[in-house]
Amino acid sequence: RCLREIYLKGFEIAVKEGGARSVMTTYGSVNGLWTAGSYDLCTTILRKEWGFQGIVMTDWWAKSNYEGHQAEVTAKAPMVAAQNDIYMVVSDAKSNPENDDVEEMLHAGKITVGELQRNAANILGFLLKSPSVLLLTDRICKEELEAMNTKEEDDVDAGSLVSIES
């Protein structure tokens, strides 16, 4: 109850009222399961209950774990299964220096090609709804794009909220 009423409330508002198109999972765990690989958080609540249709990404160099196991940087398969679409940051995807377990777990049957395709579809869907693609495909005009980027009277300028004193 505390999770939903306090910790997730801001995310719920951002998704349902603010139209958020991307969400970043935290660098931490809830009840022993790291959020980046939590199916309950990334799919059940975010996508199914709240209707989120964007992309989910990890915090940088996030860890993940299987229930009852220690969190590891190499455990990326739980993220795939949870519908966490993008792992941030991979220094060289071709050589896999982080030794992620996606290919191994795919061959072991722990994740499916369908889950990988679902994550890819989430990313592609996000890109296809980007203002750049909408403009290129004539689904919006330059004036509409400019209107999207125009500051409204009641918009908050984040720079005005921060003051740095030396």
PLM regions: where:
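Glycoside hydrolase catalytic-domain context in secreted enzymes
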Residues: 1-166
